[in-house]
């Protein structure tokens, strides 16, 4: 009687491990596949095969294997991390980030999250920048029936995905004089000046030089004291509940637009020309006054032309947000729970208003409060929300996402300058 039997799943896995160590990834994949056939309930085998596929840059196969592991064991941190790598390779950048965050929450290894997130950001930015003026461009400009030219998505977007990366035509001081603007324009090529002349000018009677009027109409703030002129970014229209966000990326000196929420193919991509509390904490009348001072005419977006009852409710929400912003810093230490509840209330109001930006205006304060009272779990929770918000709106490789205080809450909340100064308390407030 023959003693020859089919190798069991563990033996096949061991062979696969030996082949993997010898860098025979094809052979390892075959052995791991054999293990999976013998015992499809064991997550170790697809996890190992996923790693071999990653080594061969077979992103689709690696993604499928990691997903099968997650289906078998949702708590498996390695599977989330490896699927993030696979999705980065596939160009599924928003999904790659989401998987990376799942890995971080399970392991608290936020150093890896920050490092890998920066790599994802760099790869995505390079691809998006190269796609402009090509069939792969993520948007197209279309004449609308009621508000001029607008940018419309040629594919769907998820929150945090890049829509545009653009080098500006020129950069000047935010308070540049007409002569300084004219000097910047004079340095452009003839073709660039021709393209610039096609942009809208809302001040034709105010400036003798039409390029100065075009600049005043279309220039965008870049950093604390500069403004830039971008041929493409300037054509995106405004909405007081935008689905995308302007962002100046100082390290690369490029202007970027990020999706703030899901955007469908053929949907118009809309940004806000004003920011912070000037947008989310201002009534319709206040916003329109600011826009008129900037643009020279009354700009009425769909968020400013709601039925009267809805408009009044919107104004109340935004005015309450300003009140919360003003009062949150003044709660005494004895009322920290109420202070956190006020922060959570502000974030919920933003969501009710359909406003998907600037959450970090409140969450960063919450992280400091919790660290002050040595509630490290809550400090990390609010720190994660701050980091994820800034990554989505400014990029993982931006100065705001890489801010030392933000990263401190992820990596070492106990070392924050305010950590442990108050009475130890534990808070349950979450959003």
Q: Positions of the model-derived regions?
A:
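Conserved tryptophan-centered aromatic signature that marks the ligand-binding surface of SH3
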Residues: 76, 93, 154-158, 162, ...
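Eukaryote-biased feature marking scaffold/signaling PDZ-domain proteins and nuclear chromatin regulators
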Residues: 11, 38-40, 47, 57, ...
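Catalytic cores of histone-lysine modification enzymes
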Residues: 164-246, 281, 293-305
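C-terminal SET catalytic tail plus cysteine-rich post-SET Zn-binding segment of SAM-dependent SET-domain
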Residues: 4-6, 238-389, 401-408
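Short aromatic-glycine motifs in intrinsically disordered, low-complexity regions
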Residues: 143-148, 222-226, 289-291
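C-terminal helix/juxtamembrane-tail motif
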Residues: 422-431
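Alpha-helical protein-protein interaction scaffolds
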Residues: 2-124, 337-422
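Conserved AWS/pre-SET-to-SET junction and N-terminal core of the SET lysine methyltransferase domain
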Residues: 122-183, 238-260
């Amino acid at each position: 009687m023959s003693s020859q039997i089919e190798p069991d799943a563990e033996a096949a896995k061991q062979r696969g491990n030996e082949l993997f160590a010898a860098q025979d990834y094809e052979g390892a994949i075959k052995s791991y596949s054999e293990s999976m056939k013998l015992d499809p309930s064991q997550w170790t085998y697809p996890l190992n095969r996923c790693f071999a596929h990653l080594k061969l840059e077979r992103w689709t196969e690696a993604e499928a294997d990691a997903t099968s592991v997650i289906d078998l064991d949702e708590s498996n941190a390695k599977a989330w991390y490896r699927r993030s790598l696979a999705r980065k390779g596939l160009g599924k950048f928003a999904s790659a980030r989401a998987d990376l965050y799942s890995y971080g929450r399970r392991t608290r290894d936020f150093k890896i999250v920050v490092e890998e997130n920066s790599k994802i950001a760099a790869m995505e930015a390079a691809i998006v920048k190269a796609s402009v003026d090509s069939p792969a461009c993520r948007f197209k400009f279309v004449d609308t029936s009621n508000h001029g030219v607008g940018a419309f998505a040629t594919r769907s977007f998820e929150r945090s995905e890049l829509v545009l990366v653009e080098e500006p035509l020129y950069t000047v001081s935010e308070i540049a004089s007409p002569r300084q603007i004219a000097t910047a324009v004079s340095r452009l090529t003839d073709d660039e000046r021709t393209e610039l002349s096609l942009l809208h000018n809302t001040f034709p009677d105010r400036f003798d030089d039409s390029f100065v009027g075009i600049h005043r109409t279309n220039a965008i703030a870049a950093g604390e004291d500069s403004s830039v002129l971008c041929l493409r970014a300037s054509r995106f229209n405004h909405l007081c509940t935008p689905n995308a966000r302007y962002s100046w990326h100082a390290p690369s000196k490029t202007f970027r637009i990020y999706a703030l929420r899901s955007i469908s193919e053929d949907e118009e991509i809309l940004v806000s020309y004003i920011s912070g509390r000037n947008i989310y904490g201002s009534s319709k009348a206040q916003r329109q006054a600011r826009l008129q001072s900037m643009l020279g005419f009354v700009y009425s977006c769909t968020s400013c032309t709601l039925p009267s009852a809805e408009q009044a409710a919107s104004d109340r929400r935004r005015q309450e947000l300003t009140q919360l912003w003003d009062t949150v810093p003044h709660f005494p230490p004895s009322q920290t729970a109420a202070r956190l509840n006020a922060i959570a209330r502000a974030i919920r109001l933003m969501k009710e208003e359909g406003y998907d930006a600037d959450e970090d205006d409140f969450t960063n304060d919450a992280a400091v409060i919790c660290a002050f009272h040595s509630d490290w779990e809550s400090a990390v929770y609010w720190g994660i929300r701050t980091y994820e918000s800034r990554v989505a709106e400014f990029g993982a490789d931006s100065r705001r996402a890489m801010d030392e205080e933000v990263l401190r809450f992820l990596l070492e909340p106990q070392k924050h300058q305010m950590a442990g100064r108050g009475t130890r308390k534990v808070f349950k407030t979450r959003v």
